[in-house]
Amino acid sequence: MNKTYNYAVNTAASITQINVGLEQEKILIIDDFMESPEALVDIAASLPFTQYKTQYPGIKSPAPTEYTQQLLRAVVPIIEKHYELPPRSGLECTNCSFSLVTLAENDLNLIQRSPHRDASYPYQFAVLLYLCNSDHGGTAFYRHNLTQ
């Protein structure tokens, strides 16, 4: 018998907007997004992970379809509102994975140490859901020195 997981979004989650860089790029931070984030940790712990075939410094496993669908239903209206997109804008998920950095900082190659851009399309968004506390890192935003 398959175990059922709670993928429900916390309706009391707080949304904070910050603006970064010279262009004041809008970033949304949603704290306490999931009602039961431990369910995702349990799922991730039970999945087979493989080395990613790009410069990603770790391993990945596809997220469950049910979770991906729930995530999309929850974040699309938030993105549409805060980025002033038309309702039912057609945003879709292209990839949803559990990811775990496994290389130590000293083992990273030059490309893995460099800041990167996820995409340059105006209506492509990255959604990151951290399942660990801040002791395990986070995300930072940088600007290339020559463009300052």
Predicted regions and their residues:
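Fe(II)/2-oxoglutarate oxygenase catalytic core
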Residues: 1-148
